């Protein structure tokens, strides 16, 4: 689990939050349409939550994870949108803010019917739906 990896490297949740580092960013080898490496982030609280089961996958069905599924390492966040599952993981980083990738900042947002002017939408300041709608599923 990612929480075990963070603890192994001496990262303490309470100490990280005191310094304002409340997000765990993941970056992959491929690039998005904006030229920025594909990435995502989750709240650090989720990374440390034992029930969230955030993990780094290197196998799938008992075999090394196939290239098309993220070989050699994939960041997996159960219960959230697929765009948070970063393939070809190159980096995990504690941060003061969410990832700057397009899928984190511009996609998976929900705005009510009261928003009538798309130019007035505060994209970067609005959390993604993963923080509003908790999806439950199980990994065995």
Residue ranges and their predicted role:
Residues 7-140:
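Extended, aromatic/histidine-rich regions of cofactor-dependent oxidoreductases associated
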Residues 1-7:
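Long, well-ordered hydrophobic secondary-structure segments characteristic of membrane-embedded
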């Amino acid at each position: 689990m990612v929480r075990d990896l963070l603890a192994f490297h001496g990262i303490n949740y309470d100490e990280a939050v005191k310094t304002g580092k409340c997000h765990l960013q993941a970056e992959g080898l491929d690039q998005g349409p904006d030229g920025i490496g594909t990435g995502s982030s989750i709240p650090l609280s989720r990374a440390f939550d034992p029930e969230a089961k955030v993990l780094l996958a290197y196998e799938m069905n008992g075999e090394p994870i196939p290239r098309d599924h993220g070989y050699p390492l994939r960041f997996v966040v159960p219960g959230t949108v697929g765009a948070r599952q970063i393939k070809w993981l190159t980096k995990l980083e504690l941060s003061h803010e969410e990832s700057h990738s397009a899928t984190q900042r511009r996609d998976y947002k929900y705005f009510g019917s009261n928003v009538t002017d798309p130019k007035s939408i505060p994209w970067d300041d609005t959390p993604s739906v993963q923080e509003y709608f908790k999806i439950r599923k199980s990994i065995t």
